[in-house]
């Protein structure tokens, strides 16, 4: 373990967690920084593949790897949008799905270190006499995955990407492995649709907590909806309809943009979305001043 790289890794992870926790997205974060053995192995492997790393050419850009694994497919793009506002994206490798080909969809992004991380990286370089530091870039790789596809990507990376020769000429096996990914992708879509359907059923039965929980799919605190809010929603079903029809990603980004630290619970969600989008006077009348000041 190279201490300087580990410090940068921890700093990046904490920054990502701070941003995503603002709106309560369901996710897990994994990270690693390459040690000397891993760096030398990669340099040797790429040289044998005919694509060597060079001081003034191709550099190793993933000495630090960060993977954000979301519970739901639609959160991948949401996370990407949020992180693009706090991290400089240098290069992106994002696959577009093909209709007639079983192929995994990658969302891999090369990101630049910020100024303090650049300084730490430079200090690590200066303090070492190892030649391999000449082919290390001051970047990290950010990977975005869903929880269903995460295991498949781990298998693919360890048993196909790192040993490509094993798969040469075995196209049916390769197609089958990709087909397994395709089934996981289909299940990702089905999972999101399942919760949307459940949210609609809760809307029809005026189960407002069920609607909010399954529509927005956030890490809500276990705080029930206040009776005042429930009564207003029961009396005016159009408010519930607007909540159900609301574009989830757009509304969550609006919440993210607010410079206000509030607990992630259903009461705050309803009052914030009403103040930002719906504008119902009855809900505005019971909205705390601290929220009104921020959203006016």
Question: What function would you assign to each model-found segment?
Answer:
Residues 2-4, 8, 19, 132-296:
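An acidic, glycine-/histidine-flanked metal-binding catalytic module
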Residues 6-50, 265:
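Surface-exposed, low-hydrophobicity interaction/linker segments
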Residues 53-61, 131:
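Short, flexible, solvent-exposed loop/turn segments with mixed acidic/basic and small polar residues
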Residues 62-71, 142:
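Short cationic amphipathic helices and targeting signals
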Residues 77-79, 118-120, 150-153:
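Short helix/loop capping segments that flank catalytic or ligand/cofactor-binding pockets
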Residues 79-86, 123-127:
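Short amphipathic alpha-helices in soluble, non-transmembrane regions
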Residues 84-91, 163:
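A common structural junction motif
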Residues 90-132:
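Short Gly/Thr-rich strand-loop-strand
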């Amino acid at each position: 373990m190279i201490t300087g790289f580990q410090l940068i890794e921890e700093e990046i992870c904490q920054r990502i967690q701070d941003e995503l926790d603002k709106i309560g997205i369901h996710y897990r974060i994994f990270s690693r920084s390459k040690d000397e053995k891993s760096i030398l192995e990669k340099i040797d492997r790429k040289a044998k593949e005919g694509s060597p790393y060079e001081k003034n050419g191709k550099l190793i850009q993933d000495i630090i790897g960060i993977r954000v694994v979301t519970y739901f497919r639609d959160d991948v793009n949401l996370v990407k949008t949020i992180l693009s506002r706090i991290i400089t994206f240098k290069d992106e490798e994002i696959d577009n799905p093909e209709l007639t080909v079983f192929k995994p969809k990658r969302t891999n992004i090369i990101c630049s270190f910020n100024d303090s991380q650049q300084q730490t990286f430079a200090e690590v370089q200066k303090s070492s006499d190892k030649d391999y530091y000449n082919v290390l870039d001051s970047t990290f790789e950010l990977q975005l995955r869903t929880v269903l596809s995460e295991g498949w990507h781990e298998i693919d990376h360890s048993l196909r990407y790192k040993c490509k020769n094993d798969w040469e000429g075995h196209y049916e096996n390769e197609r089958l492995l990709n087909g397994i990914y395709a089934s996981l992708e289909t299940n990702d879509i089905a999972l999101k649709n399942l919760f949307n359907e459940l949210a609609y059923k809760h809307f029809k039965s005026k189960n407002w907590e069920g609607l909010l929980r399954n529509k927005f799919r956030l890490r809500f605190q276990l705080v029930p909806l206040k009776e005042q809010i429930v009564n207003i929603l029961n009396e005016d079903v159009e408010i519930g309809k607007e909540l159900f029809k609301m574009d989830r990603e757009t509304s969550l980004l609006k919440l993210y943009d607010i410079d206000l630290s509030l607990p992630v619970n259903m009461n705050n969600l309803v009052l914030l979305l009403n103040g930002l989008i719906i504008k119902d006077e009855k809900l505005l009348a019971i909205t705390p001043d601290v929220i009104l000041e921020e959203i006016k």
